[in-house]
Amino acid sequence: KSLGSCAMDGNRFPKLKYRIYQKALWVPYSQQPGVALQSHWNYSGIQNIDAWSNCPYVELFINKKSYGIVEPDQRTRQCTWRDIQWEPGTVEAVGLDTNKHPVCSEKIESSDKPYAIEVTIEKPAAKPTGEEFILKANASDAFIVTAKVVDKDGHWCPWADNLLKFEVEGEGIYKGSYNFYVTEGKDLSYHAPGDTELQAEGGLMRVAVRTTFKPGKIKVKVSSDGLISGESIIKSKKIKH
């Protein structure tokens, strides 16, 4: 989805490459130590676990049990622990300095079956001064809404592909999303612009909502059969003349 070389997909969801860059792994660890784990921990059976770090060493823990210390490849900064038996819980990669003392870490957790939908209105872009833009009732300002499928404990379900139904109430106009779901046995899944029913991709989906000329409350609700619905509210402001 999107160009393979891109750090983000068409819905602006970060790929693993984005997180690796975000950790500033190209600078010396003495300036900014960082470690990035693989995207999730939900495949069963025997598997390899990958992490990337600018530290001299990285130690892997699964449910607080150590699986050894690895030196990252000098060129790619990748380190791999092979033939690890999957078990539910928490995976942690800890970056170590030359004396093998911890200097940074990252955790990922396995998740249970899909249970609910979390709905988040993304923060608007900021001005050069750091001040956030105000959502104006000018019929052109828009905002991004993220729907995330989670388990009963609130953990993201990265394999979820539930059909999500979006509803907008109040002074907002639904503008749709980028959706090009690809899965085994279903190579392509197109949708018409403005479709309110979209299939989650990796347990996630994003849509755009535009303001009207009337200021007021905008509610976005997302539902799916068998899941607890979620919603979020934002207010558009009157234009000052």
Regions found by a protein language model. Give the residues of each.
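Low-complexity, Pro/Ser/Thr- and charge-rich linker/hinge segments at domain boundaries
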Residues: 106-135, 239-241
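Extracellular Ig-like/FN3 beta-sandwich strand-entry sites
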Residues: 86-90, 142, 215-217
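Short flexible loop/turn segments that cap and initiate beta-strands
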Residues: 54-56, 60-67, 105-107, 142, ...
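Edge beta-strands of extracellular beta-sandwich domains
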Residues: 100-112, 228-238
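Beta-strand-rich structural segments
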Residues: 51-52, 94-95, 129-132, 137-158, ...
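Ser/Thr/Pro-rich, low-complexity mucin-like regions
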Residues: 216-231
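Short, hydrophobic beta-strand segments
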Residues: 80-86, 192-213
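Extended substrate-binding grooves/exosites of carbohydrate-active enzymes
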Residues: 1-73, 79-102
